[in-house]
Amino acid sequence: MAAKIIDGKTIAQQVRSEVAQKVQARIAAGLRAPGLAVVLVGSNPASQIYVASKRKACEEVGFVSRSYDLPETTSEAELLELIDALNADNTIDGILVQLPLPAGIDNVKVLERIHPDKDVDGFHPYNVGRLCQRAPRLRPCTPRGIVTLLERYNIDTFGLNAVVIGASNIVGRPMSMELLLAGCTTTVTHRFTKNLRHHVENADLLIVAVGKPGFIPGDWIKEGAIVIDVGINRLENGKVVGDVVFEDAAKRASYITPVPGGVGPMTVATLIENTLQACVEYHDPQGE
């Protein structure tokens, strides 16, 4: 069996085009364009690349993109003050603070300072709690992007045994909640999990998010499984690979996401979707 490739790049472009059309319709109707504030503290090269891609995506769909590039020396108090100002700014629908933050700044305190209705990353405890209670508002971008991929490929998830490898706050934990909503029987594995291979071999739907190149051998994959590889790892030779041994896994899976070009583009596309949602559902004047 040769797996069908889940083309995240193409689906992400579709999502962005749909958002762009809705933005044009808003402007034609006399409403303002959605606004996203992107905050970067310090000069981490990887963060600079991520931030640039998010700003570019914003501008492509017709959003107002506001950039705040703060020096490494920025204090926690100064950053919180900026977030307070952006919370109060009626032209800003989404606030994104790029992680990791420099030493001395409390990530949790900063993320919790963003108003839940402007938390387009979906990391605020309120939004995570809503997802847990089956009443999601703004949903974490990578898990929601993965659900969008499954939906666009008409993959029926009800009753599947889903296994999530990795229990991070950004992917693993919220992903498990999305999968419960999608009707899966869900297992989350982590560093203390015994006999990881057993869990992988029984997974109808496998989502791997650990950040270790080739962590899951292809021969562990169940015949006909759906494999979603969230890992983005750069090898010493410059090649970018996922957490799953792609060539071997693709021989056994029914569907698989490539790296690059699978989950990565969906994260940014979902950020754009979330910003439009925040604008339309939480910040537009009611009744218009």
Curated annotation (Swiss-Prot):
InterPro entries: Aminoacid_DH-like_N_sf, NAD(P)-bd_dom_sf, THF_DH/CycHdrlase, THF_DH/CycHdrlase_cat_dom, THF_DH/CycHdrlase_CS, THF_DH/CycHdrlase_NAD-bd_dom. One of its GO terms (molecular function) is methylenetetrahydrofolate dehydrogenase (NADP+) activity. The keyword Amino-acid biosynthesis applies. Its EC number is 1.5.1.5, 3.5.4.9. It holds the Pfam family THF_DHG_CYH. It catalyses: (6R)-5,10-methylene-5,6,7,8-tetrahydrofolate + NADP(+) = (6R)-5,10-methenyltetrahydrofolate + NADPH; (6R)-5,10-methenyltetrahydrofolate + H2O = (6R)-10-formyltetrahydrofolate + H(+). It comes from the Bacteria. Pathway: One-carbon metabolism; tetrahydrofolate interconversion. One of its GO terms (cellular component) is cytosol. The keyword Iron does not apply. GO terms for biological process: L-histidine biosynthetic process; methionine biosynthetic process; purine nucleotide biosynthetic process; tetrahydrofolate interconversion. NADP(+) binds at G166, A167, S168, I232. Keywords: Amino-acid biosynthesis, Histidine biosynthesis, Hydrolase, Methionine biosynthesis, Multifunctional enzyme, NADP, One-carbon metabolism, Oxidoreductase, Purine biosynthesis. HAMAP family: THF_DHG_CYH. PANTHER family: C-1-TETRAHYDROFOLATE SYNTHASE, CYTOPLASMIC (PTHR48099:SF5), C-1-TETRAHYDROFOLATE SYNTHASE, CYTOPLASMIC-RELATED (PTHR48099). Catalyzes the oxidation of 5,10-methylenetetrahydrofolate to 5,10-methenyltetrahydrofolate and then the hydrolysis of 5,10-methenyltetrahydrofolate to 10-formyltetrahydrofolate. Homodimer. Belongs to the tetrahydrofolate dehydrogenase/cyclohydrolase family. This is Bifunctional protein FolD. The lineage of its organism: Bacteria, Pseudomonadati, Pseudomonadota, Gammaproteobacteria, Enterobacterales. The gene is folD.
